[in-house]
């Protein structure tokens, strides 16, 4: 061959074109696509053009390979001898095709701008501008994977250096068959490149050649790699599958166990520990279809197949699965060989194309999925990608995850290539979690010992790695986006996938997502996918929408911040007392309740290692004092007997956590980010709450060395300068340093009452134990946490109510469209807010347009009347005939005192229910009641009630806004189960009696009137007189059969009502204890005195059959039945009243044990609800 083949002529790289199914190069004038592929330099994607430099006898190629002839190749201008590299004329004269080293001839890989290559010294963008500052321009980059050549006189494209045997039949006849054939697609003939530090993120340098990077081969490859290469029938080499020899490039002094794995032992850089498979016996298609070759990094499949990508989202072509198996190159592995990860076999869609899909269709799909792109930088190319991303995952046998993998992945997350594809990455605060990047959560959580390389250890290391890129990892690797089914766990997606994800809205992740949270402690069932991580809680069966998630987070976020602040105080005190790092332990069967004070346990507590004895933080401090006395030699010891009759000394208690501190810190950080993202109003002043959660050495908590000023929060109108104006108008110039700090920080003012309440805090500076959540001027004391929350809520609502009363003037608080004493809407519910003081009447049980209106009234602590429930109630299940056969407890209720059980049976009660003449004779001042919980025998009634409940988001047991659905599994919910109440009617002349005395419920209450007896004719006249004498605000439906009268007071008036009852009621009868049965009924005369003397008025609601009354927790209320009625009551836990419910639970000394145990888990329910809300909002647009 005397003339140079056309495919070896010196044609400029940017002028070369490619066929339709080949590689499409970057055309001049076209805009390049930024971003490097974070993976192998695949054949199916565009790559920078390279020029070849022929090999020499002393090149890095081993002597066992044949080398090409001396064909004159033009040398680029200014190439010269640099750093010991020879020119093109040092080639030998040998026949056959040539093996080449890839040499950089295009500045885009280093410098980034999209322009044709300039034949001259290149000036990188990072250099000072002098040519000498770029000593590596035109440096040969040893990338043995690519070869510029041409087959069948077609346009050039990229093929492997070692071609399969079936390509030899397609060569031109004038070409000799004299190059080595690769019997396996994994053959790699080069030495292992060493990854220099210049490829790390943030380095300003480039890849400088090191003589140790590419070491010449000492022996022929066939001899050194006896387990890899040998003679092949169709060529010079073949694969020997019986043994694996040591790596060719093993450095001197290194052993096989001590050195790193071969970074690039295969064509695309896969580990050499995976079984190797030969090429397919027949060609998969046309030669030019090699442009669609792809190997999935997640599957460890080393066969190169043709076809469309696995998912439409991934722009790189993917391998189809032949009928025979997952990958065409996967042959049955020998016994004892470690198998591939087979992640591609577990993908939902699989990896196969349809059986009837032709090769042309697959090629078209592959070409559509592979848009042309252009690499702009060589930084972190195949040298880094092969060594970092294509390692075997932690679940592979005998392979553990490298500790530096997480750090490298974190570096890649902030690279400009990734940021350009998916938008600017959020700025990582300086030392958001100091120490977490070095040691994770090992100082905060003891991990069980597992075997090296086990899946549990790898998963645990992945969980403890902390937040990446400012985001909390809410899903495990198996729940990651399904764009790349071969994606390895913990490996960053390729930029093409990331860019496609940003440009195209992919909804497949939402259909398969399960909100996997690393903070979970119990299976959170969402979209029917059980997801558990730490065990210990339950959740609704379906994921919540964005609106409900925002409502949850706005109502519970502040409370969680207060809980986290108490957590930090508890950990700090424990570490000062010499307690070691807290152990993470959660037993679902053990209640989270203190054994001494019976308060709920949020997270950190002390427990006995032998029994279920647990102490909260406050009781643990007492135990800590006893521990100090033991150290000093005192004989006094505080011990508590447990089930095993063993004493609990302070030294025997172990500091324990249900959730690790690192997980709580991550949740707090992401919650504040979601707040800012969706402009959710909050009163949390912790700013970046996770900065002080840094775990130090040995579990010691480290305080930040520098106090970073808090990020400014926007006010209600988005103007951050509004608070500054208020600050300047304050004439007080003698502020304390704490005041000054509070004044400099922006003050959120979502409503006028909160602004006034926050300003009024300065009036309480002289009181050390008064602290407001709106504008704290001193750090909160640990002993007053239980009264702070209720004071905040009461003061804010009182200020708002007083402003409304002042605006309305003297008289009743009734707006337009409301009659005196009766809040009667003139039209159905409107979308806008009603006038101040008006009650809400929902005429539909499940309103489509009044849900936000209900939330606004419910947030203000107002009762709500709902009509239309009779449409779904089955009256045959709730009539006297159906309920007469059931049992129940008959009680006697008086005006002064709680209900008392009687000796009457239920049969006698039901006999006089409809016939007053058949009623048993009772005292003039008493009325009969019947109480029965709906249990297993009432399955049909319970189902009908569940389908008829209004506002199921709140009232249903599995409602998304019912915190009871987030309580831990295994916890008894008897206090929240429906209860059946039946009562005789009260005559009109006995208005001092009621069917339910004045009481305060710890949780929210819904009462549905399912049945009422027909009213007697004389009652209509008495009803008219009764309605005309109603006091306060009322709500009723004209023309309806009014059966019960409700009087509901505001929750903030409970203390004044309690003091009033102590004045007017006999000793012991005027108690208003939360959760206890009422002991007094306020008739019209007492209600008038209460209104005139104490300024406390009430709402009056008239309830008819088929209507429901919703009463918020903490609101005192009483009921009077005008006729014999049957009602069903059920409790629920709404986010708006969760803080008040927890306070009332602590105040209720006579709560039954099951009630106390339930309400003690409120903090746990808040934690679970915030987790679900944060996970939903973080993924929302």
Swiss-Prot record:
<dbReference type="GO" id="GO:0008270">
    <property type="term" value="F:zinc ion binding"/>
</dbReference>
<dbReference type="GO" id="GO:0003714">
    <property type="term" value="F:transcription corepressor activity"/>
</dbReference>
<dbReference type="GO" id="GO:0042826">
    <property type="term" value="F:histone deacetylase binding"/>
</dbReference>
<keyword id="KW-0539">Nucleus</keyword>
<feature type="region of interest" description="Disordered">
    <location>
        <begin position="311"/>
        <end position="378"/>
    </location>
</feature>
<keyword id="KW-0408">Iron</keyword>
<feature type="compositionally biased region" description="Basic and acidic residues">
    <location>
        <begin position="721"/>
        <end position="730"/>
    </location>
</feature>
<keyword id="KW-0560">Oxidoreductase</keyword>
<keyword id="KW-0238">DNA-binding</keyword>
<feature type="region of interest" description="Disordered">
    <location>
        <begin position="413"/>
        <end position="472"/>
    </location>
</feature>
<dbReference type="GO" id="GO:0031490">
    <property type="term" value="F:chromatin DNA binding"/>
</dbReference>
<dbReference type="GO" id="GO:0046966">
    <property type="term" value="F:nuclear thyroid hormone receptor binding"/>
</dbReference>
<comment type="function">
    <text>Histone demethylase that specifically demethylates both mono- and dimethylated 'Lys-9' of histone H3. May act as a transcription regulator controlling hair biology (via targeting of collagens), neural activity, and cell cycle.</text>
</comment>
<feature type="binding site">
    <location>
        <position position="1117"/>
    </location>
    <ligand>
        <name>Fe cation</name>
    </ligand>
</feature>
<feature type="compositionally biased region" description="Pro residues">
    <location>
        <begin position="311"/>
        <end position="323"/>
    </location>
</feature>
<dbReference type="GO" id="GO:0140683">
    <property type="term" value="F:histone H3K9me/H3K9me2 demethylase activity"/>
</dbReference>
<dbReference type="GO" id="GO:0000118">
    <property type="term" value="C:histone deacetylase complex"/>
</dbReference>
<feature type="domain" description="JmjC">
    <location>
        <begin position="938"/>
        <end position="1149"/>
    </location>
</feature>
<keyword id="KW-0863">Zinc-finger</keyword>
<dbReference type="GO" id="GO:0003712">
    <property type="term" value="F:transcription coregulator activity"/>
</dbReference>
<keyword id="KW-0862">Zinc</keyword>
<feature type="binding site">
    <location>
        <position position="1001"/>
    </location>
    <ligand>
        <name>Fe cation</name>
    </ligand>
</feature>
<dbReference type="GO" id="GO:0045892">
    <property type="term" value="P:negative regulation of DNA-templated transcription"/>
</dbReference>
<feature type="region of interest" description="Disordered">
    <location>
        <begin position="696"/>
        <end position="745"/>
    </location>
</feature>
<dbReference type="GO" id="GO:0006357">
    <property type="term" value="P:regulation of transcription by RNA polymerase II"/>
</dbReference>
<dbReference type="GO" id="GO:0000785">
    <property type="term" value="C:chromatin"/>
</dbReference>
<feature type="short sequence motif" description="LXXLL motif 2">
    <location>
        <begin position="752"/>
        <end position="756"/>
    </location>
</feature>
<feature type="zinc finger region" description="C6-type">
    <location>
        <begin position="594"/>
        <end position="619"/>
    </location>
</feature>
<dbReference type="GO" id="GO:0016604">
    <property type="term" value="C:nuclear body"/>
</dbReference>
<feature type="binding site">
    <location>
        <position position="999"/>
    </location>
    <ligand>
        <name>Fe cation</name>
    </ligand>
</feature>
<feature type="region of interest" description="Disordered">
    <location>
        <begin position="509"/>
        <end position="543"/>
    </location>
</feature>
<keyword id="KW-0479">Metal-binding</keyword>
<keyword id="KW-0804">Transcription</keyword>
<dbReference type="InterPro" id="IPR045109">
    <property type="entry name" value="JHDM2-like"/>
</dbReference>
<feature type="short sequence motif" description="LXXLL motif 1">
    <location>
        <begin position="560"/>
        <end position="564"/>
    </location>
</feature>
<dbReference type="GO" id="GO:0042809">
    <property type="term" value="F:nuclear vitamin D receptor binding"/>
</dbReference>
<feature type="compositionally biased region" description="Low complexity">
    <location>
        <begin position="347"/>
        <end position="357"/>
    </location>
</feature>
<dbReference type="Pfam" id="PF02373">
    <property type="entry name" value="JmjC"/>
</dbReference>
<protein>
    <recommendedName>
        <fullName>Lysine-specific demethylase hairless</fullName>
        <ecNumber>1.14.11.65</ecNumber>
    </recommendedName>
</protein>
<dbReference type="InterPro" id="IPR003347">
    <property type="entry name" value="JmjC_dom"/>
</dbReference>
<dbReference type="GO" id="GO:0032454">
    <property type="term" value="F:histone H3K9 demethylase activity"/>
</dbReference>
<feature type="compositionally biased region" description="Polar residues">
    <location>
        <begin position="447"/>
        <end position="461"/>
    </location>
</feature>
């Amino acid at each position: 061959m005397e003339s140079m083949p056309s495919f070896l002529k010196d044609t400029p790289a940017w002028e070369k074109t490619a066929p339709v199914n080949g590689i499409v190069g970057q055309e001049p004038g076209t805009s390049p696509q930024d971003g490097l592929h974070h993976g192998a330099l695949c054949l199916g994607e565009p790559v920078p053009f390279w020029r070849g430099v022929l090999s020499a006898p002393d090149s890095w190629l081993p002597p066992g390979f044949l080398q090409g002839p001396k064909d004159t190749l033009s040398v680029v201008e200014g190439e010269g001898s640099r750093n010991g590299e020879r020119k093109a004329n040092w080639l030998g004269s040998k026949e056959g095709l040539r093996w080449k080293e890839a040499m950089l001839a295009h500045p885009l890989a280093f410098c980034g701008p999209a322009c044709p290559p300039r034949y001259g010294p290149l000036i990188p963008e990072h250099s000072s501008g002098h040519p000498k500052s770029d000593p590596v321009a035109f440096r040969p980059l040893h990338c043995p994977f690519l070869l510029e050549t041409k087959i069948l006189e077609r346009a050039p494209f990229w093929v492997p250096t070692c071609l399969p045997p079936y390509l030899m039949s397609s060569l031109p006849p004038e070409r000799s068959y004299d190059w080595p054939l690769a019997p396996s697609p994994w053959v790699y003939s080069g030495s292992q490149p060493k990854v220099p530090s210049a490829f790390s993120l943030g380095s300003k340098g480039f890849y400088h050649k090191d003589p140790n990077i590419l070491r010449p081969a000492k022996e022929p490859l066939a001899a050194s790699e006896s387990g890899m290469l040998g003679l092949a029938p169709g060529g010079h080499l073949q694969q020997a599958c019986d043994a694996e020899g040591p790596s060719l490039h093993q450095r001197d002094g290194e052993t096989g166990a001590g050195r790193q794995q071969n970074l690039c032992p295969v064509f695309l850089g896969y580990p050499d520990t995976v079984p190797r498979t030969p090429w397919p016996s027949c060609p998969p298609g046309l030669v030019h279809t090699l442009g669609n070759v792809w190997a999935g990094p997640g599957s460890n499949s080393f066969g190169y197949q043709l076809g469309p990508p696995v998912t439409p989202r991934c722009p790189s072509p993917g391998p189809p699965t032949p009928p025979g198996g997952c990958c065409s190159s996967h042959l049955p592995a020998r016994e004892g060989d470690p198998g591939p990860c087979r992640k591609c076999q577990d993908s939902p869609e699989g990896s196969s194309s349809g059986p009837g899909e032709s090769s042309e269709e697959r090629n078209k799909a592959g070409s559509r999925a592979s848009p042309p792109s252009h690499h702009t930088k060589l930084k972190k190319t195949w040298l880094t990608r092969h060594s970092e991303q294509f390692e075997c995952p932690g679940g592979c046998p005998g392979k553990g995850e490298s500790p530096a993998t997480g750090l490298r992945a974190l570096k890649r997350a902030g690279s400009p290539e990734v940021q350009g594809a998916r938008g600017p990455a959020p700025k990582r605060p300086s030392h958001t979690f100091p120490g977490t990047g070095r040691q994770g959560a090992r100082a905060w959580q003891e991990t069980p010992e597992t075997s090296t390389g086990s899946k549990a250890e790898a998963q645990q290391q992945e969980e403890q790695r902390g937040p990446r890129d400012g985001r909390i990892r809410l899903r495990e690797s198996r729940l990651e986006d399904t764009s790349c089914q071969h994606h390895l766990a913990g490996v960053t997606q390729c930029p093409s996938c990331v860019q496609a994800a940003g440009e195209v809205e992919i909804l497949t992740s939402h259909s398969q997502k399960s909100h996997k949270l690393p903070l979970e402690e119990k299976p959170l069932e969402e979209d029917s996918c059980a997801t558990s991580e730490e065990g210990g809680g339950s959740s609704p069966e379906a994921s919540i929408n964005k609106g409900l998630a925002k409502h949850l987070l706005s109502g519970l976020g502040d409370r969680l911040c207060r809980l986290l602040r108490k957590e930090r105080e508890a950990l700090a005190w424990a570490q000062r007392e010499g307690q070691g790092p807290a152990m993470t332990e959660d037993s679902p069967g053990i209640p989270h309740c203190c054994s001494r004070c019976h308060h709920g346990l949020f997270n950190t507590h002390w427990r006995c290692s032998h029994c279920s004895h647990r102490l909260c933080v406050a009781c643990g401090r007492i135990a800590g004092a006893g521990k100090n006395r033991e150290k000093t030699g005192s004989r006094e010891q505080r011990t508590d007997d447990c089930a095993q009759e063993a004493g609990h000394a302070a030294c025997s208690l172990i500091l324990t956590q249900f959730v690790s501190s690192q997980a709580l810190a991550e949740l707090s950080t992401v919650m504040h980010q979601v707040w800012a993202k969706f402009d959710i109003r909050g009163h949390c002043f912790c700013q970046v709450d996770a900065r002080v959660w840094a775990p130090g050495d040995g579990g010691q908590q480290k305080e930040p060395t520098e106090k970073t000023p808090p990020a400014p929060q926007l006010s209600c109108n988005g103007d951050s300068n509004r608070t500054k104006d208020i600050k300047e108008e304050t004439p007080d110039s003698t502020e304390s340093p704490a005041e000054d700090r509070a004044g400099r920080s922006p003050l959120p003012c979502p409503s006028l009452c909160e602004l006034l309440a926050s300003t009024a805090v300065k009036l309480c500076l002289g009181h050390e134990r008064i602290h407001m959540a709106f504008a704290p001027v001193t750090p909160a004391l640990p002993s007053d946490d239980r009264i702070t929350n209720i004071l905040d809520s009461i003061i804010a609502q009182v200020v708002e109510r007083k402003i409304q009363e002042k605006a309305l003037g003297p008289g009743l608080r009734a707006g337009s469209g409301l009659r005196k004493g009766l809040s009667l809407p003139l039209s159905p519910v409107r979308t806008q807010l009603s006038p101040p003081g008006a009650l809400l009447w929902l005429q539909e049980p499940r309103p489509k347009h009044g849900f936000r209106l209900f939330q606004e009234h419910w947030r203000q602590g107002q009762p709500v009347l709902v009509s239309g429930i009779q449409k779904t109630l089955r009256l045959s299940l709730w009539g006297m005939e159906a309920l007469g056969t059931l049992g129940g407890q008959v009680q006697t209720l008086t005006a002064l005192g709680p209900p008392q059980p009687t000796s009457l049976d239920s049969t006698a009660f039901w006999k006089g229910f409809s016939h007053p003449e058949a009623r048993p004779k009772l005292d003039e001042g008493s009325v009969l009641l019947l109480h029965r919980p709906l249990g297993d025998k009432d399955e049909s009634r319970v189902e009908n009630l569940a389908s008829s409940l209004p506002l199921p988001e709140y009232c249903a047991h599995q409602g998304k806004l019912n915190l009871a659905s987030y309580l831990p599994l295994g916890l008894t919910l008897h206090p929240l189960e429906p209860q059946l109440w039946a009562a005789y009617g009260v005559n009109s002349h006995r208005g001092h009696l009621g069917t339910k005395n004045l009481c305060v419920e710890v949780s929210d209450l819904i009462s549905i009137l399912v049945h009422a007896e027909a009213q007697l004719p004389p009652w209509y006249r008495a009803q008219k007189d009764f309605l005309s004498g109603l006091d306060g605000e009322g709500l009723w439906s004209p023309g309806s059969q009014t059966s019960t009268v409700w009087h509901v007071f505001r929750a903030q008036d409970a203390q004044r009502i309690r003091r009033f009852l102590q004045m007017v009621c006999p000793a012991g009868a005027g108690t208003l204890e939360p959760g206890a049965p009422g002991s007094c009924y306020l008739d019209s005369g007492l209600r008038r005195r209460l209104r005139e003397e104490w300024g406390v008025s009430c709402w009056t609601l008239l309830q008819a059959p088929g209507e429901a009354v919703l009463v918020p927790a903490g609101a005192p209320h009483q009921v009077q039945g005008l006729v014999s009625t049957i009602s069903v009551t059920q409790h629920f836990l709404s986010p708006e009243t969760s803080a008040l419910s927890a306070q009332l639970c602590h105040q209720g000394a006579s709560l039954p044990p099951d009630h106390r145990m339930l309400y003690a888990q409120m903090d746990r329910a808040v934690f679970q609800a915030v987790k679900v809300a944060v996970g939903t909002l973080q993924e929302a647009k």
